[in-house]
Amino acid sequence: IIRDGDANSNIITRFDEISKLLFVKLYAEQNGENIFERIVFENDNMYFERIQEAYSSSVKNAKITIPPTFDRILLPIDTLIKCGNELCKINISSANCDVKGLAYEDTIKGTFDKSDNQQYFTPYQIVNFMVEIMSEYLQGTVCDPACGTAGFLTKVGDVAPLTSLLGLEVDERLAWVSSLNLLIHGNDSFTVRALPNGGSLGNEADSYFGKIDCIITNPPFGSDYTDAGILNKFSLGSGKTSRRRGILFIEQAWRLLRENGTVAIIIDQGVLNAGSNLDVRQFILKHFKILAVIDLPDTAFMPYANVSSSILIMQKAAGKVEQPLTFFAKSQSVGRKSNGDDDIVYSNTGSPSLNSDLPD
């Protein structure tokens, strides 16, 4: 409907408007209203303005932070009316949280996966595995300091509903998407903050130092950070003109965690074996207990990226570090083809399953 009604829209702007409509509908339903149902004698302009006012009101009263650029629905009148005609037929709040969450996640996947925006999206197969393998550490405050669309945090909320969830994100749009994703999943103990000045590597994240119990994240490890003011805050960045963001996230995870807190982070394998990253390995050995290293196949993030990556699981050491026995594994398949589609195999009886050696 939105694509047909607004020729100037693109997949991202359409997603933004869908999210706004879902938000105002959810907010109204919590107050027992079917906001998109027509009122007697209401003409098109009156209907349009009422929905706009309802959205503005819900934005002001919401528990989540919404960027100023998202303070108004940008759909043309006729398109908003057509969307409203469809939305008034359903009650989102009465649906099971799992169903609502899966539906919105599918919309997110269609927007951010297999497109120019894929850098914001971690494949669900890897999300599920990392959260499940970290399940015994999911307590207190669980943070994703590069939360993207909140894939990790929504899964943590499903597995460990008593945790307090914290998402940090440099992009305002993604912070808003994360908040709505968590809200639709039925989470009520979460905070998502947009940190536009350097993201969680910038000064705005300092207030969270030493307060996080567990971190699960897939930072943008393939890009360089060049802000000298920020680089000099890090022992792994001081005196350098640039450093890989993923490397800085390792040090920042150490700062964010409480003593004995744990982190599961996806890293470029160059961190583990490149000569230029010797200082990173020395930092890890000095400050963390290495619990596990799990190599991922090169297809794990294709087609957006063809990179050798690993999941590194560590515990922030309290005092002198004595390295424990470390679990090492190499995955050959994560249930994802090189084009980004699910890699499905069939048993002798015809039952489908993901072609993945990651345990359920």
Task: List where the protein language model places each region.
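Short amphipathic alpha-helical segments and their helix-coil junctions
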Residues: I1-N10, K82-C88
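Generic structural signal for well-ordered alpha-helical scaffold segments
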Residues: R3, V131-S135, W254
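A conserved structural/catalytic subdomain of Rossmann-like adenosyl-cofactor enzymes
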Residues: D6, F209, D213-D360
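An alpha-helix initiation/capping motif
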Residues: I12-K20, F121-Y124, N128
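Long recognition/docking surfaces used for binding and targeting
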Residues: I18-T111
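Conserved S-adenosyl-L-methionine
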Residues: D116-T217, G222-D224, I267-G270, V280-R281, ...
